Curated annotation (Swiss-Prot):
Domain remark from Swiss-Prot or TrEMBL: Has 3 domains, the large (RuvB-L) and small ATPase (RuvB-S) domains and the C-terminal head (RuvB-H) domain. The head domain binds DNA, while the ATPase domains jointly bind ATP, ADP or are empty depending on the state of the subunit in the translocation cycle. During a single DNA translocation step the structure of each domain remains the same, but their relative positions change.
Assembly and binders: Homohexamer. Forms an RuvA(8)-RuvB(12)-Holliday junction (HJ) complex. HJ DNA is sandwiched between 2 RuvA tetramers; dsDNA enters through RuvA and exits via RuvB. An RuvB hexamer assembles on each DNA strand where it exits the tetramer. Each RuvB hexamer is contacted by two RuvA subunits (via domain III) on 2 adjacent RuvB subunits; this complex drives branch migration. In the full resolvosome a probable DNA-RuvA(4)-RuvB(12)-RuvC(2) complex forms which resolves the HJ.
UniProt-annotated binding residues for Mg(2+): 69
EC number(s) from the headed UniProt entry: 3.6.4.-
InterPro entries, per database record: AAA+_ATPase, AAA_lid_4, DNA_helicase_Holl-junc_RuvB, P-loop_NTPase, RuvB-like_N, RuvB_C, WH-like_DNA-bd_sf, WH_DNA-bd_sf
Location of region: Small ATPAse domain (RuvB-S): 185-255
GO MF annotation, one: four-way junction helicase activity
Residues bound to ATP: 23-24, 65, 68-70, 131-133, 174, 184, 221
Record organism: Shigella sonnei (strain Ss046)
Protein name: Holliday junction branch migration complex subunit RuvB
Glycoprotein found in the keyword field: no
Classification of source organism: Bacteria, Pseudomonadati, Pseudomonadota, Gammaproteobacteria, Enterobacterales
Transmembrane segments: none
Family: Belongs to the RuvB family.
Catalytic activity reported: ATP + H2O = ADP + phosphate + H(+)
């Protein structure tokens, strides 16, 4: 199954997701959830502004859809500087990165999404830029080649990744601030859904927002995507007002169940239960059983299932928990 086909995928960006930019928080005081990250960043930003320094380099990691790009925008807004945005796969050559770095103004923020996908050549250029605000460039070729150093203005690099373990140690060690974004709690998601509904001009009850939040897998991007589909249902099937009952009907129609699981989540859990007797099962076998790539299972499907206690990752493989068996109304086997 193609990941983009999943309504509750947080790892893909649909064209309509551009509308989310208008409802994204611009400042820390508008930022909902992630209380530890918010309080720490408030201190770090205030301290940097008091000293008149650029904010230290920041690494943000966590599952997709939790607001890494939003946080980068907030940092730039709070610091009162420009934000330059790119991604690891786009920076194919050292010259691509050099061009971006030399165009930065003092204290500007350079945001690199999917930073774990930087090529080794580009990453080498980044080391002196991060550490010494210098760019080492080779001029010429062969025996006549020489290296020149270009001074860069103090800047902040913000790197975002869903796979912090894939970063090389030299790159990871150069970030002075490291923040992990966690799945959102339902009350925070309910607030986000209500706020988005107001921006979209929708009439939505608190219970309606709660119903969407409960099924959003702890992820704001999914919450906003579900809200738009619920809006469509409410406008076509009813008078446009979104109550808890209308939201539940819409989400049931979309095959998003009360736990926020869709077809792929249920397929994975049922494969572990039915085909492998609850596990343990190795990742490669599980990927073959459900027709998915192992990276998709690791990065997209598993994190939420593990965090919610439906799947367990053990040294011997993946295992379905008692909660997973109960979710499908199947009696779990007795422990030996």
């Amino acid at each position: 199954m193609i990941e983009a086909d999943r309504l509750i995928s947080a790892g893909t960006t649909l064209p309509e997701d551009g509308a989310d930019r208008a409802i994204r928080p611009k400042l820390l005081e508008e930022y909902v959830g992630q209380p530890q990250v918010r309080s720490q960043m408030e201190i770090f930003i205030k301290a940097a502004k008091l000293r008149g320094d650029a904010l230290d380099h920041l690494l943000i990691f966590g599952p997709p859809g939790l607001g890494k790009t939003t946080l980068a925008n907030i940092v730039a807004n709070e610091m009162g500087v420009n934000l330059r945005t790119t991604s690891g796969p786009v920076l194919e050559k050292a010259g691509d990165l050099a061009a971006m770095l030399t165009n930065l103004e003092p204290h500007d923020v350079l945001f690199i999404d999917e930073i774990h996908r930087l090529s080794p050549v580009v990453e080498e250029v980044l080391y002196p830029a991060m550490e010494d605000y210098q760019l080492d460039i080779m001029i010429g070729e062969g025996p006549a080649a020489r290296s020149i150093k270009i001074d860069l203005p103090p800047f902040t690099l913000i790197g975002a990744t869903t796979r912090a373990g894939s970063l090389t140690s030299p790159l990871r060690d150069r970030f002075g601030i490291v923040q992990r974004l966690e799945f959102y709690q339902v009350p925070d998601l309910q607030y986000i859904v209500s706020r988005s509904a107001r921006f979209m001009g929708l009439e939505m009850s608190d219970d309606g927002a709660l119903e969407v939040a409960r099924r959003a897998r702890g992820t704001p991007r999914i919450a906003n995507r579900l809200l738009r589909r619920v809006r469509d249902f409410a406008e076509v099937k009813h008078d446009g007002t979104i109550s808890a009952d209308i939201a539940a009907q819409a989400l049931d129609m979309l095959n998003v169940d009360a736990e926020g699981f869709d077809y792929m989540d249920r397929k994975l859990l049922l494969a572990v239960i039915d085909k492998f007797f609850g596990g343990p099962v190795g990742l490669d076998n599980l990927a073959a059983a459900i027709g998915e790539e192992r990276e998709t299972i690791e990065d997209v499907l598993e994190p939420y299932l593990i965090q919610q206690g439906f799947l367990q990752r053990t040294p011997r493989g993946r295992m379905a928990t008692t909660r997973a068996w109960n979710h499908f109304g199947i009696t779990p086997p007795e422990m030996p």
